[in-house]
């Protein structure tokens, strides 16, 4: 059981290298490298743009008192898809593109929705207090008294 992560990493690297060699054989090495860089740029922009858009949508649902769990699952799947596209390799790109498909996102939402709980805190996160305690409201005015000051002669020569 403790060898399972090592075997999984080895299989992942083997699959990525095998696919990379096959694609480079068909398209050429330069075009293959350009394709890998292109998918990384797409992944980076996807994480930045779609993640922020879904975060705003989640906040709107929470403000309306609705359950934002579906948007949370969609946001997480978009972020994971973007990260998979960001990693170099065609196998991770394929998995990332799968997570971008709406039927896959819907299937994930249906499977994960029963495991998520949503609760809303009444009154928001912060309260202003009831005004109790020993707080007094008042005004003051500063008056300088000349008697409290010592006169000092300046003997310096300019």
Curated annotation (Swiss-Prot):
The protein's matches in InterPro entries, at most eight in alphabetical order, are given as: FxsA (IPR007313)
- List GO terms (cellular component aspect): membrane; plasma membrane
Keyword Glycoprotein applies:
no
Q: Where is the composition biased (Basic and acidic residues)?
A: 139-158
Which controlled-vocabulary keywords does the entry list?
Answer: Cell inner membrane, Cell membrane, Membrane, Transmembrane, Transmembrane helix
Tell me the membrane topology, using the record's own terms.
Multi-pass membrane protein
Give the matching NCBIfam families. Answer: PRK11463.1-2
The protein's name in its UniProt record: UPF0716 protein FxsA
> From which organism does this entry originate?
Escherichia coli (strain K12)
């Amino acid at each position: 059981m403790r060898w399972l992560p090592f075997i999984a990493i080895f299989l992942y690297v083997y699959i990525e290298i095998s696919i990379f060699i096959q694609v480079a054989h068909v398209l050429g090495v330069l075009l293959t490298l350009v394709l890998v860089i292109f998918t990384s740029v797409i992944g980076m922009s996807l994480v930045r743009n779609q993640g922020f858009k879904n975060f705003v949508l989640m906040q709107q649902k929470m403000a309306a008192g609705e359950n934002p769990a579906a948007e949370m699952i969609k946001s997480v799947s978009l972020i994971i898809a973007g990260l998979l596209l960001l990693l170099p390799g065609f196998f991770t790109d394929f998995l990332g593109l799968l997570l971008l498909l709406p039927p896959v996102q819907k299937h994930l939402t249906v499977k994960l929705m029963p495991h998520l709980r949503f609760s809303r805190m009444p009154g928001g996160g912060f309260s202003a207090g009831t005004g109790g305690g020993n707080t007094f409201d008042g005004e003051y005015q500063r008056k300088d008294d000349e008697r409290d000051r010592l006169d000092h002669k300046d003997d310096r020569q300019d």
